[in-house]
């Protein structure tokens, strides 16, 4: 199991990014609201970040900026790019983006995947070896000779990922890789992304598919209107182990803490608990809730609208709960306060 | 009369008459050369117009579309005024020579190549361009790949331009002068021979021209029907 937050130097560091589309009539836009405004995002080597958000939340635009396809008006993007050689200095290398509906060239699958090596004038033997290896990774070895435009959606997506991987990028960007494709391809892609991350590649992908996001992500980055918004759930890594009884299961976190969850999810690796579903109290309360922990407040953050996000350390795991201003005052919550943390087994969703 | 001429014309075609051959070769030579010239200039311009944004792009596209309908005699007049002894390029002595016809026909073909290449390529998926950029292709490599992905549109543009110049008479007449064994083409020969009442050669040449024109149209139809997958236009 990978560490949740890598301590290594960031593979990607975004600061103060602002982007707005130029006005259509060519006139200088009058300080239009930026469609993407990301103040800070850091990603370590081997981490998977998943952008989630509605249509129009700026995920695709953000990915295109990171790929160097759109130029931001201001801000800094620093990327470690040891994997991607540039072509004759014509264009400095950038993270490689796989589009939501990838464009495959009207030629064979092999030629598609070999193209990035061909434009870099890689020697024939190495080109062949690296292309076949990328095809193998995506389970496409049998399709090398097929006419790419005739493939199914899932196969096309896998070819597009192989075509990006053949460059061995240190940062891979994927826009909705699992939309409109078959389950088999989704599983293949998830496995490949996990293996890539384990080999040190930083992955940023956007998705609508929350289950896929929770399964894969080291970091979930919720977005709305082009901005990062606070995450509203706790994501815990671990394993769902044997059932406590026929109704209640047990999820053992990587930190060793056991929490109760709905039964019948053995093998799940991720537990998700909404921050709204966590009750904080000064004394232990007797309720139907099966999970009763104790936690030490480590940070408090205002969310606006008289809501606060309280970060607690409960026997090694970090949980966040949302509380109102009134509760903050009644419980005198501040860093260092010891609180009882209660949530129902049914509030734990497993993926 | 027409029937007997037709019989003689077929005889002329079968016998491989040297004058008929010379005229046909001239025609094809001028048409192929001018189309190649127009393609060399027009295809890159069409691609650039399709993939890049630049100021006044819409105006340039409109002008190019409008020029597709350029009357051949106007092109003849324009190039004539440039190449005539008193014109700016008069010193080259090109007027009434094969290069003059080729230049004139290339001017005629250029807007067709540009407009049709632009039109075909701008219908390609916009993600093609972004894909090429993110995969690290250089500007030149991107241009090549876009032309390759839109190869059917490019080929159609070239064939259409060829069909236009091989059958035109204004430029060939005004700039070539219809000089026997030198600049006489199928169209100028038909115009002259018909005016003289010599139908045999006219009909034989008409048959050749129709075969060429039908061949081009057949090729175009074949290209339009041949759409291997989403990469084609």
Which stretches of residues belong to each language-model region?
Chain A
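Helix-to-loop junction immediately C-terminal to a conserved catalytic motif
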Residues: 67
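Glycine/charge-rich catalytic "coupling/switch" loops of P-loop NTPases
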Residues: 255-301, 325-351
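Hydrophobic anchor residue at the start of the ABC signature
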Residues: 161
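Conserved ABC ATPase "signature" region
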Residues: 125-143
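Catalytic Walker B motif of ABC-type/P-loop ATPase nucleotide-binding domains
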Residues: 172-176
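Conserved ABC ATPase signature
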Residues: 147-151, 155
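The feature captures the beta-strand-to-loop junction immediately N-terminal to the Walker
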Residues: 52-54
């Amino acid at each position: 199991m990978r560490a949740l937050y890598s301590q290594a130097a960031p593979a990607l560091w975004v600061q103060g990014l602002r982007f707005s589309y130029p006005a259509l009539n060519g006139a200088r836009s009058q300080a239009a609201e930026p469609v993407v405004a990301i103040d800070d995002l850091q990603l370590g080597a081997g981490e998977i970040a998943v952008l989630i958000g509605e249509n129009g939340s700026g995920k695709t635009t953000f990915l295109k900026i990171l790929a160097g396809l759109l130029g931001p008006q201001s801000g800094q993007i620093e990327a470690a790019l040891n994997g991607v050689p540039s072509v004759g200095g014509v264009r400095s290398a950038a993270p490689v983006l796989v589009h939501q509906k990838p464009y495959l060239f009207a030629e064979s699958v092999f030629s598609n995947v070999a193209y990035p090596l061909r434009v870099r004038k890689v020697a024939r033997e190495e080109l062949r070896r690296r292309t076949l290896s990328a095809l193998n990774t995506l389970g496409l070895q049998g399709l090398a000779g097929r006419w790419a435009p005739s493939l199914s959606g899932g196969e096309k997506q896998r070819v597009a990922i192989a075509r990006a991987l053949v460059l061995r990028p240190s940062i891979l960007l994927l826009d909705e890789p699992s939309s409109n494709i078959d389950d088999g391809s989704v599983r293949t892609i998830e496995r490949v992304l996990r293996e890539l991350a384990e080999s040190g590649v930083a992955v940023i992908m956007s998705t609508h598919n929350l289950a896929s996001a929770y399964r894969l992500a080291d970091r979930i980055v919720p977005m709305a209107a082009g901005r990062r918004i606070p995450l509203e759930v706790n994501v815990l890594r671990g394993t769902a182990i044997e059932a406590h009884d026929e109704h209640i299961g047990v999820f053992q976190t990587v930190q060793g803490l056991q929490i109760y969850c709905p039964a019948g999810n053995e093998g799940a690796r991720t537990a998700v608990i909404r921050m709204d579903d966590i009750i904080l109290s000064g004394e232990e309360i007797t309720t139907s809730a099966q999970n009763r922990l104790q936690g030490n407040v480590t940070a408090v953050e205002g969310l606006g609208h008289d809501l606060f996000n309280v970060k607690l350390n409960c026997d090694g795991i970090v949980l966040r709960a949302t509380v109102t201003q009134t509760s903050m005052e009644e419980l005198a919550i501040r860093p260092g306060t010891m609180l009882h943390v209660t949530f129902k087994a049914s509030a734990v969703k497993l993926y | 009369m027409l029937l007997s001429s037709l019989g003689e014309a077929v005889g002329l075609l079968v016998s491989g008459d040297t004058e008929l051959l010379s005229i046909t070769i001239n025609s094809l030579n001028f048409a192929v050369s001018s189309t190649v010239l127009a393609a060399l200039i027009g295809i890159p311009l069409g691609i650039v117009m399709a993939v890049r944004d630049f100021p006044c792009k819409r105006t340039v596209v409109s002008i190019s579309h409008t020029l597709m309908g350029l009357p051949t005699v106007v092109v003849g007049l324009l190039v004539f005024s440039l190449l005539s002894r008193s014109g700016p390029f008069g010193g080259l002595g090109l007027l009434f020579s094969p290069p003059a016809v080729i230049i004139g026909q290339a001017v005629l073909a250029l807007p067709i190549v540009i407009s049709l290449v632009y039109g075909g390529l701008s219908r390609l998926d916009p993600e093609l361009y972004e894909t090429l950029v993110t995969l690290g292709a250089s500007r030149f490599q991107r241009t090549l790949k876009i032309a390759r992905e839109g190869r059917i549109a490019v080929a159609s543009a070239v064939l259409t331009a060829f069909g236009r110049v091989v059958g035109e008479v204004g430029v060939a007449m005004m700039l070539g002068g219809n000089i026997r064994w030198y600049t006489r083409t199928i169209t100028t020969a038909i115009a002259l021979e018909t005016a003289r009442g010599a139908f045999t050669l006219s009909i034989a040449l008409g048959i050749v021209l129709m075969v060429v024109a039908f061949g081009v149209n057949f090729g175009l139809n074949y290209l339009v029907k041949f759409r291997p997958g989403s990469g084609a236009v």
